[in-house]
Amino acid sequence: MKTITLNIKGIHCGCCVKSLTQVLTELDGVQSADVQLEGKANITFDENRVNVAQLIEVIEDAGFDATE
């Protein structure tokens, strides 16, 4: 397992946090996602099942901007 912190733009409220947490944790290979209102997400994932580019893509598909 690997843990990464991503910077996320576009998180404005608790609903954004909940929505993004749900999208990430539903992704195959993600063990946990701690999304913070301050624009950070700590994600623990299995590198053999998902990669950072896929995490960023899912976040962007949900309407947010993400960078490492």
Curated annotation (Swiss-Prot):
InterPro entries reported for this sequence: Heavy-metal-associated_CS, HMA_dom, HMA_dom_sf
Positions bound to a metal cation: 13, 16
Keyword line: Metal-binding
Molecular-function GO term, any one: metal ion binding
Keyword Signal found: no
Organism whose genome encodes this protein: Haemophilus influenzae (strain ATCC 51907 / DSM 11121 / KW20 / Rd)
PROSITE patterns: HMA_1, HMA_2
Domain of life: Bacteria
Record CDD domains: HMA
HMA domain segment(s): 2-67
Keyword Membrane: no
Protein name: Uncharacterized protein HI_0292
